[in-house]
A protein has these predicted regions:
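Metalloprotease/metallohydrolase-associated module, dominated by Zn2+-dependent proteases
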Residues: 2-3, 14, 18-26, 46-81, ...
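Surface-exposed acidic, glycine-flexible loop patches that form ligand/cofactor-binding
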Residues: 29
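Juxtacatalytic substrate-recognition/specificity segment
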Residues: 37-41, 65-68
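Short alpha-helix carrying the canonical HExxH Zn2+-binding catalytic motif
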Residues: 79-96
Length: 189
């Protein structure tokens, strides 16, 4: 954990950011995201010299870095039903990349569920980008990585509505992560 624009990293920051990774990997075998050995924490949005834009978070697999805006991270967990959660979003990117990077944690996500996810993702991105009414916000249509990250935000924050709107995708993510938020939260379907 590396401070950027914050005085120091608190235990609360370490625990909560780590918990966001555990939330996604809880149903999987032990995953430590070993490729990502640096987590940079900014207090708020930060400027990227690479994109020439302000960002709230990002995952850079080449550099092994996860970057978090602390304010946006906290805001994401303050409202658990708006499907905007920076912690879930950035950790979704991290597990997506970690699964593809050849290391001791390579290919921990089930191949059958991943193949199904790829097909559903392609279908749904077309719907989003042709302005068809969609359960997900438009940003999910940017690419397969953003689709996955946005899908996991909805999976954990609006599971009942998600299952109703996109049952095949919900069931695929349930298999992929080996967990079901509806059962976990004991929600009515």
């Amino acid at each position: 954990f590396i401070p950027r624009g914050v005085d120091h990293i608190t235990d609360e920051m370490r625990v909560l950011i780590s918990a966001s990774a555990i939330q996604l990997t809880f149903g999987l075998r032990k995953i430590f995201l070993t490729h990502f050995d640096k987590i940079l924490i900014y207090m708020d949005a930060y400027y990227s010299n690479i994109t020439q834009k302000y960002h709230l978070g990002e995952v850079n697999p080449r550099a092994g870095i996860i970057i978090i805006s602390w304010k946006s991270f906290i805001d994401g967990y303050a409202n658990l039903s708006d499907s905007l959660n920076l912690g879930i979003h950035e950790m979704a990117h991290a597990i997506h990349f970690e699964n593809k990077i050849r290391n001791e944690e390579y290919e921990f996500l089930g191949k059958d569920a991943l193949l199904r996810l790829e097909k559903i993702t392609a279908r749904e991105i077309v719907k989003i980008n042709t302005k068809q009414e969609h359960f997900f916000r438009p940003y999910a249509g940017a690419n397969e990585y953003e689709f996955f990250a946005v899908a996991l935000e909805y999976f954990f924050e609006k599971p009942t509505e998600f299952k109703s709107a996109l049952p095949d995708l919900y069931d695929t993510l349930k298999k992929l992560l080996n967990q079901d938020p509806i059962s976990l939260y004991k929600l009515a379907v």
